[in-house]
Amino acid sequence: MTNQIESYAAVGLSPTVYGVQKREQIKMNIDHLHSVCKAACWLTSLDLPVRLIVIPEGALQGFTDEVFDMDHQKYVEDIAIDIPGEETNLLGQLAREFNTYLVASAKARETEFPRLFFNSIFLINPQGEIVLRHRKNSPLFPVEHSVCPHDVWDKWTQ
């Protein structure tokens, strides 16, 4: 006999995204995501409870590094986030408020690689905790400036 989970709705958002020049500006996109999540959860939950919200790539920071061909180190210093960090804490508040899992992505720093950023995706549970994290393995060359694990493989596998 199998245990079947209760039916639920998943919401994929397509928010307006503002390309940021400084990390502090990311909060503007997160505030907008809150409004979009609120509307989407209200409307979608008329049928089934929303248990999963997916935020698209670029929704936190935009694609400033790609559009303006930014220097990698400048992006690390000015825009890349920490996971966990201030921005993921704000997203965790959204997950708690709407009692849902939340998938998001961001270009983020790694403690072991302080001068690099990775394009990371992460899953936040309804308690606001990051429970899964993945780094993009195949950035779109030549436009994506993020590093992938293959670029630093020897140190990555230590």
Residue ranges, per PLM feature:
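Active-site catalytic loop in hydrolytic enzyme cores
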Residues: 109-158
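A short, hydrophobic beta-strand-centered structural micro-motif
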Residues: 82-109
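Well-ordered, non-membrane alpha-helical segments in soluble/globular domains
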Residues: 26-39, 84-89
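Active-site-proximal beta-strand elements of phosphoester/diester hydrolases
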Residues: 4-26, 54, 120, 133-135
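Active-site beta-strand/loop signature of hydrolases that rely on acidic residues for catalysis
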Residues: 36-72, 95, 102-103
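Surface-exposed, active-site-proximal loop segments in enzymatic domains
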Residues: 20-21, 64-78, 113-123
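A short acidic, glycine-rich active-site loop
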Residues: 74-89, 154-156
